[in-house]
Amino acid sequence: MRKLVLASAMMCAAASQAVADIKVGVLHSLSGTMAISETTLKDTMLMLIEEQNAKGGLLGEKLVPVVVDPASDWPLFAEKARELLTVHDVDVMFGNWTSVSRKSVLPVVEELNGLLFYPVQYEGEESSKNVFYTGAAPNQQAIPATDYYLEELGVEKFALLGTDYVYPRTTNKILEQYLKDKGIAVSD
């Protein structure tokens, strides 16, 4: 009986010491055209994880980064997100810089019920229970700037410019309607 109690106590002690790690997926381009912007975000995540672990982790559990390189290739972002969630079994992902990379990852994150923190401004008009959009949307950035030009600077005419890309196209569509609602025509 004594051996049984001792063995049970040892098993309980071992189980209480076995703390599960929290795997943090880092989904930023380390190569290709976006590497110049996204490598810094990867480095920042690794620094923050190291600092948090030095303070005892999160709720007593160690944070373990799992870094992948989607290589500035939008379809590869989806594949790497799937890899992080299924092969590496991460608990959360931090990543993407561009709207198109986020939109590539979104169906995978929703299908596998993952969690993504998206770090930069975005065009709005998208909502998912699986994504924390941490950057400003047009109603938090572009609209207040437009109001400033209208109210403080007295600007009466606007020309909406941007590259042929998701963020500027969508933001300009929102701004065009906003200006139209205020009775201001947008130049062609």
Task: Locate each region found by the language model.
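Beta-alpha junction/loop-to-helix N-cap segments that form part of ligand/metal-binding clefts
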Residues: 36-43, 56-125
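Extracytoplasmic ligand/sensor domains, especially the bilobed periplasmic-binding protein
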Residues: 89-188
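Immediate post-signal peptide segment of exported/extracytoplasmic ligand-binding proteins
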Residues: 18-26, 55-62, 150-156
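Generic structural signal for well-ordered alpha-helical scaffold segments
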Residues: 53, 82-85, 146-150
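Residue-level signal for short, function-critical loop segments
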Residues: 30, 71, 164
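Short beta-strand segments enriched in small/hydrophobic residues
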Residues: 21-40, 96-97, 157-161
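Short, polar/charged alpha-helical segment
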Residues: 37-59, 174-181
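Gram-negative bacterial Sec-dependent N-terminal signal peptides
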Residues: 1-19
